[in-house]
A protein has these predicted regions:
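Catalytic cores of extracellular degradative/oxidative enzymes
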Residues: 8-216, 221, 231-232
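Pan-zinc metallopeptidase signature
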Residues: 202-291
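Pro/Thr/Ser/Gly-rich low-complexity, intrinsically disordered linker/stalk tracts
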Residues: 283-318, 359-371, 395
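Beta-strand-rich modules
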Residues: 341-359
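C-terminal edge beta-strand
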Residues: 365, 369-372, 436-446
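Solvent-exposed, low-complexity, repeat-rich "mucin-like" stalks and linkers
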Residues: 372-403
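Serine/threonine-rich, repeat-prone extracellular segments and beta-strand-based repeat modules
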Residues: 401-442
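Extracellular carbohydrate-recognition regions
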Residues: 446-473
Length: 476
């Protein structure tokens, strides 16, 4: 092929008026039409492997077919994709890409990146290409234009290592509170996409099964309400859950008749609107019967209250995020290690609930706006046998305004530095009739060599220098 490409490019250069600048390739999923000039630049001048290039584009479309539940199987006409191809053509000098009935059109500046295989080039064209293919694959009875077609684009983007385009920050902002702050029709495209995508996160075959139901049953809704009801009905069937509560959380209203029909499915209290793409391929056990060792500290300013969360590092890969409850009502959800309440008052009580990626929850921690803070220099200290140890050297105490009240900390310690072993130091701080407790582990080892063999791990301290022991072999 390269020999023919070089010869044709030479002919094109010598006689451009009578030679068509045309290049095509055909795979089992794509009929691609572009220019000889771009093909020459990519395959000859830049040395991109032709087979890798064509396979790359073909695999994007094949993955879209797979995501839709399509397969080459003539015995299953509703889901058969035998001999079905996507036509992609160079069609316009401006814009980026578009979808029409029988083809996806791209522009000239877009073309070379389509043929390249490096990650940067792929990232520059992948979303737009699969977005347009999604328009072609969208089923009218189920399509929300510029939203549902992005199910294919988002899937492709994530699978290729690019970002998830769902705007979870605003989904949490609008939906986490007891009463949703915004409904589906008021959301932007990428927030609306979340309503569909989070069901895919709940069950990774959701979209394929949903598409199959639409192809098989061929519904024809008479109005927008029927369209919404059909989506809720089919989605509930696929997940085997009465999803009334989920769609209503999104402000995606269902008819009374639809709600009644959905009562035949099992109910659920899972907060699916907390899911994000970090749960994909998660196989952990979550937080059932697990001590997350969640610690919450509170700091207060004149205008807000900031909650800072810390969890057992051994289960951080299981963590989805934290639900924030204020005075008995949910006010937010965050995947960050802190949350700021900008509508705080002096008498508020907070609860923080850790959520695992399978939506199981750990023990909640309660804290009030008057709770003092205990700041440990580190969670674990290692000492040599016989070494001096003062438990108060590793802790400080503060009011919720940040005033130092370390002198009020009470220490309960069973540490015996004359005997090897693992010990616990418990710190208790009471201020304004509110008590806070924290613990630190102390390990006493036998000699210098044993201690020097300990491997350092990344450690965070609020103050001071983390240490195994300040007196042994220069370790500080």
């Amino acid at each position: 092929f390269l020999k023919e490409l070089k010869e044709y490019k030479k002919k094109l250069d010598e006689d451009p008026e009578n030679t068509v600048d045309l290049f095509e390739f055909n795979t089992n999923r794509i009929l691609y039409t572009g220019t000889t000039s771009s093909a020459y630049k990519v395959y000859v001048e830049e040395g991109v492997d032709i087979e890798k290039s064509t396979n790359n584009l073909n695999s994007q479309i094949q993955e879209a077919f797979d995501f839709s539940g399509l397969k080459d199987d003539i015995s299953d006409p509703s889901n058969d994709s035998t001999n079905i191809k996507t036509t992609i053509r160079l069609m316009q000098p401006y814009g980026l890409a578009y979808a029409y009935v029988d083809h996806v059109g791209i522009q000239r500046d877009y073309e070379t990146s389509m043929l390249k295989t490096d990650k940067s080039s792929l990232g520059s064209v992948l979303w737009a290409t699969v977005h347009e293919v999604g328009h072609q694959m969208d089923i009218d009875a189920r399509a929300w234009p510029e939203i549902t077609n992005n199910m294919w684009a988002n899937n492709a983007h994530i699978k290729q290592g690019f970002d998830d385009r769902v705007n979870y920050t605003y989904i949490y902002k609008y939906l986490a509170p007891e009463k949703s702050l915004r409904g589906f029709e008021e959301m932007d495209y990428f927030q609306k996409l979340g309503m569909f995508w989070q069901l895919q996160l709940k069950k990774d075959t959701y979209w394929a099964e949903l598409e199959s139901l639409y192809r098989k049953r061929k519904p024809s809704p008479n109005n927008y309400q029927q369209k919404k009801d059909i989506l809720a009905t089919y989605s509930s069937e696929v997940l085997n859950i009465n999803l009334t509560y989920y769609f209503e959380k999104y402000g995606f209203d269902l008819s009374d008749e639809c709600k009644e029909k959905l009562k035949k499915y099992p109910t659920s209290n899972e907060k699916l609107w907390y899911l994000n793409s970090s749960v994909m391929n998660y196989e952990g056990q979550g937080f059932d019967n697990v001590d997350t060792n969640l610690d919450v500290t509170l700091s207060k300013s004149k205008s807000n209250i900031k909650l800072t969360m810390n969890i057992n590092k051994s289960i951080k890969n299981d963590l989805l995020g934290y639900e924030i409850i204020k005075d008995g009502k949910v006010i937010g959800f965050t995947t960050e290690s802190s949350y700021t309440d900008n509508e705080a008052n002096d008498n508020s009580k907070y609860e923080v609930v850790p959520y695992a990626k399978n939506l199981t929850t750990g023990r909640n921690v309660e804290i009030s706006s008057s709770t003092p803070n205990i700041s440990l220099q580190q969670e674990k200290v290692t000492l040599k046998i016989g070494e001096d140890f003062n438990a108060k050297d590793y802790v400080k105490g503060f009011t919720y305004f940040g005033d130092d009240i370390t002198s009020k900390i009470e220490v309960d310690s069973n540490v015996n530095t004359n005997e090897c072993g693992t010990y616990t130091v418990k710190y208790t701080l009471t201020n304004e009739n509110t008590t806070k407790q924290k613990s630190m582990e102390v390990e006493v080892v036998s000699d210098y060599d044993y201690l020097s063999d300990f491997s350092w791990e990344s450690i965070k301290t609020d103050w001071g220098t983390p240490r195994k022991n300040g007196n042994i072999q220069g370790m500080t």
